[in-house]
Swiss-Prot record:
The lineage of its organism: Archaea, Methanobacteriati, Methanobacteriota, Methanomada group, Methanococci. It comes from the Archaea. This is Uncharacterized protein MJ1567.
Length: 175
C-alpha cells in the first residue's frame, strides 16, 4: 500500500462523503474545486495555495481560484487507483463534465479538528447537505443556513516591485 499524506487523505475523505462511499456515484470537479478553495481558506489543507486560472465554469470561461497542489494530489490518488475519474460530454453544453468517485477505500488518519470542519461544512445530522452549483461557485444549504462559496471571486493581492538593471548587452560581449 502506498503511503498518503494528510492532504491526500482529506481529498479522498471529501470525495467519500460526497459520494456516500458508493463507487458508482460521482462528484463533479467544479464542486470539488470550490470545496478545496473553501477549505484552503479555512486552513484545512496545509501547504495548499490557489491562483486564478481560466476555467470553463457553467458554460462560461471564467477565472477561478484553483490549487495546483490539490490537482497534483488528485492525480496521485488517480494514478494509485484510490480515485476514479470520468469525463462526460453533454449535448447542448460547450463543456465537458469531469467527475470523481472512490476507487480504493482507506483508513483516514488525519487531524481530528480538520475532520470536524469538513463534517460540519458538508453534513447535517449525519446526512449530506444539499449542494447547488451557481454562476460564481457553489451554495451549501442546510435547514438553518446557506453557505455561499464564490470560487470566481479573485482576491486582489498587493505587491511591491522595483526595477533591476541586468548587466547584459546584445552588442557587447565583454561584460
Amino acid at each position: 500500500m502506498v503511503a498518503m499524506n494528510e492532504n491526500q487523505q482529506k481529498l479522498h475523505y471529501i470525495i467519500n462523503l460526497l459520494t456516500n462511499g458508493n463507487k458508482k456515484r460521482w462528484v463533479k470537479q467544479t464542486v470539488l474545486f470550490a470545496l478545496i478553495y473553501y477549505f484552503i481558506k479555512l486552513d484545512v489543507f496545509k501547504g495548499y495555495d490557489y491562483a486564478p486560472t481560466p476555467f470553463m465554469w457553467e458554460d462560461e470561461i471564467k477565472f477561478i481560484n484553483i490549487s495546483y497542489e490539490a490537482i497534483n494530489d488528485l492525480n496521485y490518488l488517480l494514478d494509485n487507483n484510490y480515485l476514479n475519474e470520468i469525463l462526460l460530454s453533454v449535448r447542448g453544453l460547450n463543456e465537458f463534465i469531469v467527475g470523481y468517485s472512490i476507487g480504493k477505500k482507506i483508513d483516514y488518519n488525519f487531524n481530528q479538528k480538520d475532520k470536524e470542519t469538513i463534517d460540519k461544512t458538508l453534513l447535517e445530522n449525519g446526512r449530506l447537505k444539499e449542494i447547488q452549483i451557481t454562476k460564481n461557485g457553489i451554495i451549501i444549504k442546510s435547514k438553518n443556513e446557506k453557505l455561499e462559496i464564490e470560487i470566481t471571486k479573485i482576491d486582489k493581492i498587493s505587491y511591491k516591485s522595483k526595477s533591476y538593471i541586468m548587466k547584459v548587452s546584445l552588442w557587447d560581449s565583454n561584460i
